[in-house]
Each structure stands twice: as C-alpha cells, then as structure tokens.
Amino acid sequence: MANIKSQKKRILTNEKARQRNVAVKSELKTAIRAVDKAVAAGEAEAAAAALRTASRKLDKAASKGVIHKNQAANRKSGIAARVKALLG
C-alpha cells in the first residue's frame, strides 16, 4: 500500500476506472454475441440491428480509451463480414 497521499488517491481512481472498463468490455462481448446469435439463427433484420448497436458500442469504447481504435475496427469488420455473408 502506498504511503503518499496522491498515490492513495490514484489507487482508488485506477480501481474505479478498471471496474468501469470491465463493465464496458462485458457490454461489448454481449453485443457481439447478439450479432453472432442472430447470424446463426439466420435472422437478417435482427443481425443488422445488432450490428448497428455493436458498432456504436465499439466506437464509443475506442473513443473512451477502453479498447484501442484498431481493435475496435478489427472487431467491427469481423462482425460486419458475418452479417454481410448472411445477407448475401
């Protein structure tokens, strides 16, 4: 445990940020799973809607620094390709 006051504050701040990041990453996984589930079921409309939601969440996570922008782009292109294959 740190002895310096500012470091004690940083420990608390870092823990809050870590928990927020874990929650956001969990939301991302859920959104991507929703896309995969819709694609597996062959539901084109639901897959397209889930793709829009997941893309928005990925962009927001990248802009907030939760994930890297290249990782967001890579994940978006992957789910978009799966949806596009479903749509034909």
Curated annotation (Swiss-Prot):
Any one GO molecular function term: structural constituent of ribosome
Keywords assigned by UniProt, alphabetized: Ribonucleoprotein, Ribosomal protein, RNA-binding, rRNA-binding
Function of the molecule: Binds directly to 16S ribosomal RNA.
Record bears the keyword S-adenosyl-L-methionine: no
Transmembrane feature ranges: none
GO biological process, one term: translation
GO cellular component annotations of the record: cytosol; small ribosomal subunit
Family the UniProt entry places it in: Belongs to the bacterial ribosomal protein bS20 family.
Recorded coiled-coil stretches: none
The keyword Lyase is annotated on this UniProt entry: no
Gene3D superfamilies in the cross-refs: Ribosomal protein S20 (1.20.58.110)
Protein name, entry field: Small ribosomal subunit protein bS20
